[in-house]
Regions:
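Glycan-processing catalytic domains of CAZymes
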Residues: 17, 26, 99, 120-122, ...
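Alpha-helical packing segments of well-folded alpha/beta enzyme cores
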Residues: 26, 30, 82-86, 90, ...
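C-terminal domain-boundary segment and adjacent tail
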Residues: 2-3, 177-193, 244-322
Length: 322
């Protein structure tokens, strides 16, 4: 990392992130791709993926009954131990693990994050870190290899469905040592700023040549394309539209304000596996380009903290690009 001189252009950061981060095949696929182009990326772990189905009652979502969630739990013991191995391997390779919280409770399964209080968010994060530190005891798997990543390495995350009352969640971030978030919807592609006591990497919007004005996340691309209908036969069309959108975002930022580009995804196989291959193709073609660094959120924060405050302020004052 280097400190910019006044007037010097920053590198073009690209931050790949994956919500959920609980699928072995996808961990393997993206770790292998990243290794080819010296990329680092972030996985936002759903905490209940560390609980076997048998021990799902260890989780109580705020306002919900024990053992209930809007997503699956971790499966059997072999699946959970495989996930822990994936997390350990990814972290050792320089990738980052953050939080996607736990039960994925949103407006469609209330009460969701948009209505939770600070106490609710504290409970959600207390449980996330409780699973992180205690999954072996909860699941009865004390003889298996531990999760080797210190809980203190989890510094940020993304809320399910991008929901939250930010005044309510901010004290919970502070109480759990979180230093960044990437949940609040933004406008365009812009430099992160300090908001609510953390670095806020606002979710980006772009004027996609293929999709029009859209929030830059895989599910939002899908919804804009066909209202998120499962049409596997159209996977090549979706893939092309998503890849064109990523390329447009990169070029807009590279020749514009050089703000970090957020490639926000889930590990998924939606609509005939249209989305993850587009993200991987973009990673492979972009991360080796000159003046380009594919990094984690913590990497970019460390770089920003290294800069002269006046230089960083000039970057943050640059208008958003679309």
């Amino acid at each position: 990392m280097t400190r910019l001189a006044p007037g010097e252009n920053p590198p073009q950061f690209v931050i790949f992130s994956f919500d959920g981060a609980g699928w072995h095949d996808r961990w393997t696929e993206f770790r292998e791709a990243a290794a080819q182009v010296n990329a680092r990326f972030t996985g936002f772990l759903t905490g209940i993926y560390l609980l076997t189905d048998e021990h799902r009652d260890a989780y109580t979502g705020p306002g919900h009954s024990p053992g209930k969630a809007s997503v699956n739990f971790g499966g059997d013991a072999a699946t959970v131990t495989t996930l822990v191995g994936d997390l350990n391997a990814a972290w050792m390779e320089g990738h980052e693990i953050g939080t996607h919280y736990n039960g994925h409770f949103c407006a469609d399964n209330p009460p969701g994050g948009a209505s939770w209080s600070t106490a609710d968010w504290n409970s959600e994060l207390d449980q996330f870190f409780g699973f992180w530190n205690g999954w072996q005891e909860i699941d009865g798997l004390q003889g298996t290899p531990p999760l080797a990543i210190p809980a203190s390495e989890v510094k940020g995350g993304r809320t399910p469905c991008l929901e939250g009352n930010w005044d309510q969640i901010a004290p919970a971030w502070a109480a759990h040592g979180l230093t960044y978030d990437s949940s609040i919807p933004g406008s365009g592609i812009a430099w992160p700023k300090q908001e609510y006591g953390v670095w806020e990497f606002r979710m980006q919007t772009t004027s996609s040549p293929a999709l029009g004005s859209v929030m830059a996340m895989d599910y939002n691309f899908w919804y804009k394309f066909n209202k998120a209908k499962n049409q596997p036969e159209r996977a090549p069309e979706i893939h092309a539209a998503v890849l064109e959108t990523y390329r447009h975002m990169y070029e807009a930022a590279f020749i514009g304000n050089r703000a970090p580009v957020l490639v926000a995804n889930h590990f998924n196989q939606w609509s005939g596996n249209a989305f993850n291959p587009a993200a991987k193709e973009f990673m492979l073609e972009t991360c080796g380009k000159p003046e380009t660094i594919c990094a984690t959120y913590q990497d970019v924060i460390a770089w920003m903290n290294l800069q002269d405050p006046a230089v960083l302020a000039e970057l943050q004052a640059r208008p958003a690009v679309y």
